Design a protein with these regions (language model features):
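Acidic donor-binding loop of glycosyltransferase active sites
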Residues: 183-187, 352-365, 377
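C-terminal amphipathic helix plus adjacent low-complexity
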Residues: 7-13, 18, 26-42, 421-548
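Nucleotide-activated donor-binding/catalytic signature segment of Leloir-type glycosyltransferases, i.e.
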Residues: 156-161, 325-344
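Conserved catalytic-core segment of nucleotide-activated headgroup transferases in glycan assembly
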Residues: 118-127, 242-336
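A short, active-site helix/loop in glycosyltransferases that binds the activated sugar's phosphate group
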Residues: 53-69, 226-251, 326
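Catalytic binding pocket for nucleotide-activated donors in carbohydrate/polymer assembly enzymes
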Residues: 360-436
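Conserved active-site histidine-acidic residue motif and adjacent donor-binding/catalytic loop
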Residues: 166-174, 321-325, 338-350, 364-365
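N-terminal subdomain of nucleotide-sugar transferases
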Residues: 2-159, 309, 526-548
């Protein structure tokens, strides 16, 4: 079962998806180039973000754009960025703390209360407060940080700032971010979204503290390769893409940092709360709904329904998806022994009662898998040998054969785990020890020290990008998967997300166009231009005087 078994017509269709996405990306990137040629650098940066946002959600067959990277590097050296700041009320932090500690500036786009990306930052901070001071700048953050993240930052002696609360102008944000780096940081860690252009504009000149790109979105297109002195890749399959397809000069593995989990509550108590019989074998899976979408011969729902139907003592708990559609149908087929619970924050009760963890496919969920594996649960998943970046999760788990290569192997191994208690306990213990060795201190710290040792003393822009990889099954798989899970993600959606960042006059033009094509309220909210409206009137008035 793999993409190689698809018919040639299916493969041709996936290649057409790549070409379709690439054409639309190129049109958006050209608009950024046109804006640069017209001298409107603010508009150029926004259109670069729009193009990157579209490519992030509708894979175009490549992971980096030399055209956009070069454009953003030219903006980085323009007077609009290199000039002095004209924000007299801005207080650039100056470090006055423990000078024996290295200062790390974490640049994020946004922080989230759920999801592994933000937790990675928090755990990295908490693991290293003995030798690092950590601060955060958010390029699009407007709401407060999750309390556990803000607490980690301040406990280390650091601070946090949100650029949207200072200015709506992306060029000014880039200048401010550059000043934060020069005035405070010893090292910069990038955790930004794939479409965030600010790091490239801010750090697109030689000199200053080195820049580390934490590659948390290693399977999709992204900006920033030209300003990364070192890539910190979370897994080997992502590292392979960074080296061949992103032009990474140096890539080092940095496993996702974890913390020692609390002791498990006796499973009898957890099962009692969930009204589950103590003799049942509990299967658990946790992931976003889209990761279970059937594609390319990989059908999680059909596969696990067959397992639960075969083994009457098995109950599957599904956390993430809603109880609807195929999930609801599957539950009915096995008389309710598949329980679909939606999104939940109280994950511990499910960890405590589970016997076996089923990783999602065709799109695996690394953070969830590591969290449960660290608790001693045996993990099983289905590997995609043709498009490994979506299922080959972690350098610590491969040799333990947690992820098998065929549906038949999956059914056999999972069946044995359900029927053989000692076997699953042995597998769980093996899984836990492997994860502990790389994801907890002191083992994890060995990787971090290797990453830090690879950083140069001074930042140097990576130009030109050296790309050697070609389009492969990873690309076609993602293109087809996007077509199912991101079918509604159009050019208009990407424009609508970023239009408020454009200069006022251009926003007005888009609004008029949008009223005919898309919902104008999404394209240009009123609050997006009220702040610039008075300045626009003044400029128009002065321009009219000049014509008289």
């Amino acid at each position: 079962m793999s993409l190689s078994t698809d018919s040639s017509s299916d493969h041709d269709r996936l290649v057409e998806h790549l070409a379709w996405a690439a054409d639309r990306f190129n049109a958006l990137a050209s608009r950024a180039g046109d804006a640069e040629q017209a001298g409107d650098l603010r508009s150029a940066v926004v259109w670069a973000q729009i193009a990157a946002d579209f490519a992030w959600h509708r894979h175009p067959g490549f992971y980096v754009s030399p055209f956009l990277e070069s454009l953003l590097l030219r903006v980085a050296t323009s007077p609009e960025i290199t000039g002095s700041l004209c924000l007299p009320d801005l207080k650039i932090p100056v470090f006055d703390g423990d000078h024996s500690k290295t200062r790390i500036l974490h640049v994020i786009t946004k922080a989230y209360a759920t999801g592994g990306h933000t937790r990675l930052i928090e755990r990295l901070i908490n693991n290293t407060t003995d030798r690092y001071v950590h601060s955060i700048v958010g390029t699009e953050q407007e709401s407060p940080l999750p309390p556990w993240l803000s607490s980690a930052v301040t406990s280390s002696g650091g601070w946090y700032k949100f650029l949207p609360l200072i200015t709506t102008n992306l060029l000014k944000r880039a200048r401010i971010l550059r000043q934060f780096r020069y005035n405070w940081a010893d090292i910069v860690f990038l955790h930004t979204h794939p479409s965030d252009a600010l790091p490239t504009v801010s750090f697109g000149i030689d000199g200053g503290p080195p820049v580390l790109l934490v590659n948390h979105a290693d399977h999709v297109f992204g900006l920033g390769s030209t300003v990364a002195d070192v890539f910190a890749d979370l897994r080997l399959s992502g590292q392979a893409v960074s080296r061949a397809r992103r032009g990474a000069r140096i890539s080092k593995i940095l496993p996702i940092p974890l913390i020692e989990p609390p002791n498990r509550t006796p499973d009898s108590l957890a099962r009692e709360k969930l009204h589950i019989d103590r003799d049942s074998v509990i299967l658990l899976t946790i992931a976003s709904s889209y990761k279970y979408t059937a594609f390319g011969g990989y059908d999680f729902i059909a596969t696990v329904t067959e397992v639960v139907a075969r083994h009457k003592q098995a109950i599957l708990l599904v956390v993430g998806p809603k109880a609807q559609g195929r999930w609801l149908e599957a539950s009915r087929r096995v008389e309710g022994r598949i329980r679909v619970l939606g999104r939940r924050n109280d994950l511990r009760i499910f960890h405590d009662c589970a016997d076996i963890y089923l990783d999602s496919f065709p799109f695996a969920s690394l953070t969830s898998m590591l969290d449960v594996g660290l608790r001693g649960l045996p993990v099983i998943g289905l590997r995609n040998p043709d498009a490994p970046i979506y299922t080959d999760l972690d350098l610590t788990l491969g040799p333990s054969q947690t992820h098998v290569g065929s549906r038949d192997e999956y059914l056999t191994l999972l069946g044995k785990m359900i029927e053989d208690e000692k076997f699953r306990h042995d597998k769980g213990r093996e899984c836990r020890e492997r994860i502990r060795g790389s994801h907890l201190v002191p083992g994890w710290d060995v990787y971090l020290r290797g990453v830090m040792a690879a950083l140069p003393k001074s930042h140097r822009v990576n130009r030109p990008l050296k790309l050697c990889g070609k389009t492969d099954a990873n690309d076609t798989f993602l293109a087809g998967f996007n077509d199912l899970t991101e079918a509604g993600y159009s050019v208009d959606v990407s424009i609508g997300k970023h239009a408020r960042l454009l200069p006022f006059a251009e926003r007005g033009q888009l609004l008029l166009q949008g009223l005919r094509k898309v919902d104008g309220r999404k394209l240009l909210p009123l609050k997006a231009y009220l702040g610039e409206f008075p300045r626009f009137l003044v400029k128009s008035f002065l321009a009219s005087l000049g014509k008289k």
